[in-house]
Each structure stands twice: as structure tokens, then as C-alpha cells.
Amino acid sequence: MALASCNSPKSAGENPFFTQWDTPFGVPPFDKIRAEHFMPAFERGMSLHDAEIDAITSNNDEPTFENTILAYDNAGQMLAQTELIFGMLCAAETNERMQALQEQVMPLLSAHRDKIRLDEKLFARVKDVYDRRASLGLDAEQSRLLRKTYDAFVRSGALLDAGQKARLKEINGELSLTAVKFGNNILAENNNFALELTADDLEGLPSGVRDAAREKAQAMGKGDKWVFTLHKPSLIPLLTYSTKRDLREKIYKAYLNRCNNGDEYDNKQLINDFIRLRTEKAHLLGYPSYAAYVVADEMAGTTDAVYGLLDQIWEPALERAKGELSEMNTLLQKDIPGATFESWDWWYYAEKLRKQNYALDEEMLRPYFSLENVQGGIFYLANRLYGITFQPVVVPLYHPDAVAYQVLDADGSHLGVLYFDYFPRDGKSQGAWCGNYVEQTYKDGKRVAPVVSVVCNFTRPVGNTPALLTLDETETLFHEFGHALHFLFHDVKYRGLTEVEGDFVEERFGLVERQQRRGVAHRTGEVADDAHHGSDALAVPVGLFDIVAAPRPLTLAVTREEVEIEHAQMRLVGVEHLVGDRLRMIERRHDGLEGDLSLIHI
């Protein structure tokens, strides 16, 4: 990898952030970027940004949209570009050097942002334009940019007094470092755990799962073992298929107790710090809780609206969960009479219930969804719906696992570049996400195309067997691809208008995710072509399509779990009062659910 391949510092003149990129389609020159380039780039970026802000505040002309709002929107582009690349790489391909840089850089960036957003002269000019907005003859885009700019200053503390601003700066600096430490601790715990199994421990595991565990063991120099980790493609199959209840318990508890072991990676105090600092920040800014502060800038608007939706879903989801729990407990009693249903039993007996009640076998379906064919189905769907096409391109890559495509609009014009990075590794965070390495903007009246990346953690190919996706993984890929489409279709004049409310964004791309299920379910639908067997290129048989088309088992039970998680998150950020320096958390229990079922899913 480029960031780790060079140990000797480069001179400032060779820093790729200081030159115009001559790469295809303007993608970042990953083959030239080194870890040591980032700090000089951040320092220069902040210095240039300061100069651009000084030019605005020292302007003696009357504040206008052009000399204040637009000038502010255009400021800080080098810094923003450096932040994008650094942030994306810290999530997808980090190492100890990058993590150390994070801890050094994030407080500096926090202080820099606060200095600008709390600049009284700058805000006075922004407010002057905002107060006269009705008489300025602004078009719709200009009006929205003006409002978003003003609101961003207010939400950042521009209306606070000097003492409050000073405290807010301290809080933001602490929060920035706390967030970095928290994420790095999680990554370390994910990477530190390895469950070594022998041949006697493999009962119930499909051959593909065994092969992947064997390959991991060989990579670790433990060729006589089978190794399972806390990465989802390893963790979930063991929980789902292993007949060894003690092994399921061991890996489940290891995952659940990450950063909760009283060691150097323990996050309990960091969580307490998060809640304490966020609550104090919300109070400074005039909100009863951090949840109220966050939601005020989303479509929901208020915490009451959020709770109203969650409570509306909760009761029917809870009733369905109770019924399915009862069925799974019956299966458990047949295997182990008198046993108490535990969290680590959920995946195993949910799979048994799927087979028993719905004839749905994930392992039976999986061979028909090779990663290559699912990706082809995504491209096919996008072409049918939007007329866009995808062409493989040779561009600099930040890791050998990544692949890149040029995306062409229906008229053949360049829309952007799309990277895919599918497989887990030690330097990558868990989960799936989509982000930009280069944001869409306009320069000299011409559209600057975005460079977008979809990052996942799917099972790697093993030997001659391609990467085969579960239905959940297929839906994840469609969901993240929906975000990618959003970025690729961006065509806005102003940088400040590229962001969309988070709750709106997630719902939109839930629609793309659901389009996948409908398409797979209807063999004459748009994405039926993504369902070809990885080995013989045969379409999924009619009978299997009918199974997938049927109402999905356990959907509402999963919804119950998801709603409970949302409730828990709202409670964590909805704290209004703290007792001393310690937060006393009270776990809500629901009638009719016994045992630790608030954590039945991962």
C-alpha cells in the first residue's frame, strides 16, 4: 500500500497535495501519497483557508452574497480535499502511523473550524447578508446556500458569549480526540481476537466457511487449525451454523465485550466522556439534549417525532419477535431440554426456523449470488433505470483489493469514477459505507466530477471459489450503491449544498436496497440478471425465486431489534442531566421478553 510502502520522508516539493494531479479523471494519486504528506498538507491547507477568511473579513465593501457567502463557500478547498482523502483512508486502510496522525490532526482541525465559525467579524458579515435576504433578489440555490450558511454558524455557537465560546472550543477539541481513540480501540479489538478451532469443532459448518477459516489460519501460520475472527464474514457463519453452543457463546461474548475488558482498549470511560461532553455542548447551544441538537437539523426536526415513529413500530415488531422467540425456544428445548435461550442462540435457531417454516436456506441460495454477478446485476439495474454505464479503468489504487470504474451518463458524458473495496482486512473498519475522495463541484464554470468509493466487508474468495454473497450482503451492496448514485448524480453549483439531511438520505437508499429484493424476486424484473450461479452462469431456478419472493422470515423480529437499538441510541444522546461525573444508565426492560434479548443480533 502506498501509505505504508515508504519509510523515508519526502520533501515538500514532492508532496502530491501541493501539485495539480495528472491522473486519469482527476482521481487521487494514491501511488504517490504517503502518510508523511498529510501533516504538511493540513498545515498549508489551514494556512490558505485562514488567508481566504481574512480576505473576506477585511473587505471594506458592503457584505454581499458574492463577496461573503460565495467567497466563504469557495474557501478552504485544499484543506477539504486533504480531509476527504485522509478520512476515507483512515476508515478503509489505516495503520499505526495513520492512527497516530489522527490523534495529532483531529484536535488541530477542530480548533481551526471553531476559529472560523466563531469569528465575530465573519459572522457579522454573514448575518448582514442574511438579514437583508428578502431584498437581494437571490435565486432558489443562492437562498438555500445563504440559509444553510447562517444556520451552520448559529449551530456552531456564533451567538454565544465569549466565555461560552471558549468552553465550546474545549469541548469540541476533546470530542474530536475521543472519537478517534474510540474507533481505533474498536479496530484493535477486532484484530486482536482469533478463535482457533480443531477438526472436532467444525460440526455443522458449511464447506465454504471451513475453507475460509482454514485459509485464515494458514495466513496466520497456524496451518493445522481453523481460525475465526470478529470480522462479520467469519463471525456470522460461526454463530449461524456451528452446533457447538460453547463456541457460539465464546465468539459472541468476545464480540459483545469488545473494548469492555478493563485493558488499554477499554472504551467505557470514552463513552462516558462522549455523553458528558455532548450533553454540555447541547446545553451551551440551547438544546435540552444532544439528540435534540442533532435532530433539529434533520427532517424529523424533534426528538418527539423520532420517538413517535419508533413507538409506532415497536408494538407490532415486539409481538412478532415474541412469537418467533417462542418457536426458536421450542427448537432449543428439543436439542437441550431445560436450557435458557441466550443471545448466542439467536442466529443458529433463526436459521433452523427459516429452513423449517420457509424452506429458505441461505447456503443453498448463496452460490447463485457471486460477487461478480451481483455487481453485474447492480450495473444492469442502473443502466435500465438511468441509462448509465460502467467501464473498468486503470487508475491509482489505495489497496490491491480495490477496483475502479468510469461511470458514463446516458449521453456518454463522464459522470464520475466509482471505486469498490469489498473485503475485510486488518486496516479496515467493520461495516459498509460510501463516501467521496473527490466531491462534485464546479470550477471555472465546468463540472468537476466526483470520485466515489463503496467499501464493504464481504467474504473473500477462497481458492477457486468466488466470493459468494448472502441475501443480506446483496442488500447491503445495493444500499451502498444507492449512496454512490447519489454522489455520482450530484450537479450543484455550490459546495455548501452537497449535503442532504441524514434521515432523508438513508430512506432514499433503503429504496434502492428494496428494489434489489423485488427485482430478484420477480424473475422478469430488472435485476433478474444478477442471479446467476457463480460456477455455471445459470439463472436462479424458479422455485428459489418463489422462496425469495415470499414474505421474508424474521423481518419484524429484526425490526424489533433495530428499533430497540435506535431507542438505545436516542437514550444515549438524549440525556438531559448528569449526576456528578458519572452517567447512570438504566436499561429498559419490556414485558414478555426474558433474558438478554436486547442484544439478539449483531
PLM region descriptions:
Residues 145, 177, 184, 188-229, ...:
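Active-site-proximal, well-structured secondary-structure segments within enzyme catalytic domains
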Residues 472-487:
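Active-site recognition of the HExxH zinc-binding catalytic motif
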Residues 414, 490-517, 521, 528:
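Acidic/histidine-rich catalytic neighborhood
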Residues 516-517, 523, 527-537, 547, ...:
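Alpha-helix boundary/capping motif
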Residues 600-602:
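Conserved small/polar residues in nucleotide/adenosyl-binding loops
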Residues 3-5:
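C-terminal motif of bacterial Sec signal peptides marking the signal peptidase cleavage site
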Residues 11-206:
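N-terminal helix-rich structural modules
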Residues 22-37, 86-105, 128-170, 229-269, ...:
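Short His/Asp/Glu-rich catalytic/ion-coordination signatures at enzyme active sites or charged loops
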